[in-house]
């Protein structure tokens, strides 16, 4: 059998870019199908409470929602998933944690069938937080996206009480301007639990906090390189993403480093805490998430 040709670095990059281009084209088609599904759902639910099917019920949702940013990592097979077959990985993850932050929807707009799979595979009470499609945040950058946001938010109608937050992550090149702040807040569906994560430090300012508080939009606090290291509270609930302190995704948090955030959250008086660990290297995320949850429960 002939050996596969070894691709150069440039060829591998071109191949990846081609895949991404195809995926982005598919996202447009999937968004159109979700749009039709949302309109049909709204026709059937015209007489229902407009907040029906909204994210997990505030009365029954646990106060601490702590988990990882994704669960299907091949490099966890020798750590978190040791001796567990791949088909059982989600079952194992959901037995250890009550929530997951899904990153895949950022790259691939979910189909209705995909969302139904999420529902089927999850145990009762398990909560999904969903990262919003790059079509909205990175390609269109909140320009002419009101309908797209509503269409993507239809996922919450499908998940019902298994829905947590929608996390909108903006790129590092997207720096603060008053116009961009207005674009974001005017395009969000404020019947949902919205979280916005910025990767440019200019967004850490009082004008942003004031506008977020007015709309009850959650400002995502970040533990990440070159970003302000502080907890920002703009709603009754707080949301923190742990990416790593000096290096993205590769930092193993010490107990002391986690405790700094526990104390900040405790001092904030937040009604609910959403915390997701994105430092997936070497399975650090699962270990750190468990330790963080233990500490924050102990602090109350």
Over which residues does each language-model region extend?
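Residues lining hydrophobic/aromatic ligand-binding pockets adjacent to catalytic sites
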Residues: 1-300
């Amino acid at each position: 059998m002939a050996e596969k040709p070894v691709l150069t670095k440039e060829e591998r990059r071109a191949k990846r870019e081609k895949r991404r281009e195809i995926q982005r084209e598919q996202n447009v088609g999937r968004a159109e199908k979700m749009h039709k599904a949302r309109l049909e759902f709204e026709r059937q639910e015209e007489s229902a409470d407009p907040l029906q099917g909204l994210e997990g019920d505030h009365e029954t949702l646990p106060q601490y929602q702590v988990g990882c940013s994704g669960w299907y990592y091949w490099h966890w097979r020798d750590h978190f998933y040791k001796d567990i077959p791949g088909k059982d990985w989600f079952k194992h993850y959901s037995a250890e944690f009550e929530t997951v932050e899904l990153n895949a929807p950022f790259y691939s707009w979910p189909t209705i069938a995909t969302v139904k799979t999420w529902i089927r595979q999850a145990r009762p009470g398990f909560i999904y937080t969903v990262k919003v499609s790059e079509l909205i945040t990175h390609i269109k950058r909140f320009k002419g996206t009101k309908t797209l946001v509503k269409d993507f938010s239809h996922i919450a109608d499908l998940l019902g009480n298994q829905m947590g937050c929608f996390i909108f992550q903006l790129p590092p090149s997207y720096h603060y301007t008053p116009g961009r702040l207005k674009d974001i807040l005017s395009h969000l569906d404020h019947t949902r639990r919205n979280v916005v994560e910025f990767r440019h430090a200019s967004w850490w300012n009082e004008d942003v906090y004031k506008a977020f508080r007015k709309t009850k939009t959650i400002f995502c606090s970040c533990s990440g390189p070159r970003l302000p290291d502080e907890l920002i509270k703009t709603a009754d609930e707080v949301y923190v993403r742990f990416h790593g302190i000096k290096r993205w995704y590769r930092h193993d948090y010490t107990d002391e480093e986690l405790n700094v955030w526990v104390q900040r959250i405790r001092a904030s008086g937040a009604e609910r805490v959403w915390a997701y660990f994105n430092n997936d290297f070497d399975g650090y995320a699962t270990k750190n998430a468990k330790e963080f949850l233990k500490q924050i429960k102990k602090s109350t």
